[in-house]
Every structure is written in structure tokens, then in C-alpha cells.
Amino acid sequence: MPNPLYRQHIISISDLSREQLECLLQTALKLKAHPRGDLLEGKLIGSCFFEPSTRTRLSFETAVQCLGGKVIGFSDGANTSAKKGETLADTARIISGYTDAIIQRHPKDGAARVAAEFSRVPVINAGDGTNQHPSQTLLDLVTIYETQGRLDKLKIAMAGDLKYGRTVHSLCQALKRWGCEFAFVSPPSLAMPDYITEELDEAGCRYRILGSLEEAAEWADILYMTRVQRERFDEQEFAKIQGKFNLEASMLARAKPNLRVLHPLPRVDEIHPDVDATPHAYYFEQATNGVYARMAILSLVLNEEV
């Protein structure tokens, strides 16, 4: 079967068909079961992080090296010519002349699409502001499939910062293709954006608003927790919402046996450490799946056949 992702930019989940998502999912599972160290042999990847990152940057760079490739780049935009006023378009033009693909994280919404417009090589969005985070979505799909055995018609609860959390936006856009049902738990000021709920309506996916994490845990197959992103608020606003939706082990007492709690990490206090010892906790395994998901993205974008 032809590779539907060869030489493609990976900018937004909404750009990808269900066929492309399934290809990415199955490739990630295959590479997890049977790793290969030759798929990026002779390839040089630009890792361009204008915003702080631990898991995303390190798992992408791990993926490149596990596949036999090499990485150049930076982990702080303050140490680049962007500090001197160089435009993102010019940066993309320059780095695409050095590399076979660019992995980019940027604090500005839409930055990945700008880079893709001016790059001569594929651009992989590692997060652009509050907008999209497609590689996180793929590792979430891998984890959900791994724990539930399917993606079709699952019950997905999302809690915390649903307004600014790019991970939940991308995940809704992906899982609507499998007819999932959603529940949202958040302060009103951090509710899921209208454009996402409108997309769910158009796809015929049901969703509900729940008032507590206990309700969500009892209802869901997956409880996807998010961090209230302090860096996106001033101190006064943050104080009003901090600690409103924090998960503790006691809240999982009526959860179904198959419930898994996921989190894109880092966590602060929204998941108490006592949850870690429950059979429902799966966020550390989820983070590990980031390597395989990103191996799949890089392999498919840079090889005609995998």
C-alpha cells in the first residue's frame, strides 16, 4: 500500500484523514513491537524549539537517534537569530537548507503553518501556542488503543484547562473520526472552545458537561487530565482557578475496571501522587509511547515505504 504521508507536513490533526491516522497508529505499534534502526540512516533532522519542552523534544530526538538519524537544533528561541528580529519564514528557509525535516515548537498559534509555507522540507508541528499538537495526539491514540483494544465509540472525559490545552483540541479532532462520545469537566472560564464543540456537532458526536471528576471517572473509558497552564495567566487569574479540578485516588472508587487516566504531562497538583499506585494510572506509559509515535511520524514522512 502506498505511504499516504510521504513528504507531507504534519501541522494539524484536522489536515489528516482517518486513513493517514490509522497508518500512523499501526506504524507506531509495529515499531514498538519490532524496532528498526535504519529508517533515518543518512538523514539530518532540525529540532527547533522556541518554547520550553522536556518530553516532546527529548522523545523526538530519541526517536531520530533510534531510527539511525542525526539531530541539530536548539531548545530555546532566545539563543537564535529570532532574538535579533529574524522572521519565522526566513528561519524556516535557512534550516530547511540544512536538514531533511524540521521539528518545530513555537509559542505562537499558526507558527507551524508559516514554517511549512516557506520550508523546502517537511515540517512537523511539535506544538504551536494553544493551537495544535499532532504528535501528542498520535501518542494518545496509541495509548488509548493499547489500553482499550479499539478506538471506536469510546467514552472520553477531558478535565482541567480545556480552553488553552492544545492536546485536548487535537484529540477531539482525531477521535471524532471514530464516533467517540465526550464529557468535559472544567471551570467555565476554561471550557472547551466553541469551534471544537461545533466540529463534534458536525461529526454527529455527542458530548456533555459534567460537574465533577467523580462523575467523569464513573462514566468514562478514558479520563484525560490536563494542567492549568500557569504561564498563560497572570497571577490573579491563576489564583482563581488553581486546584479547582484535582484528581485523587478516592475519586476513582466507582470507576470501571478498564478506565485509564491519561495526562500529557507535566503535572503539578491536578493528579495527586496517590493515583499513581492505582490500576487506572497510565500517564507514564503514555509518555513512553511518545518515542514510538514520533518514530512513526518521522519514518513515514521521510520514507516511501516503511
From Swiss-Prot:
Classification via InterPro entries: Asp/Orn_carbamoyltranf_P-bd (IPR006132), Asp/Orn_carbamoylTrfase (IPR006130), Asp/Orn_carbamoylTrfase_sf (IPR036901), Asp_carbamoyltransf (IPR002082), Asp_carbamoyltransf_Asp/Orn-bd (IPR006131)
Top-rank taxon, per record: Bacteria
Enzyme superclass (EC): transferase
Any Gene Ontology biological process: amino acid metabolic process
HAMAP family: Asp_carb_tr
Subunit structure of this chain's protein: Heterododecamer (2C3:3R2) of six catalytic PyrB chains organized as two trimers (C3), and six regulatory PyrI chains organized as three dimers (R2).
Protein name: Aspartate carbamoyltransferase catalytic subunit
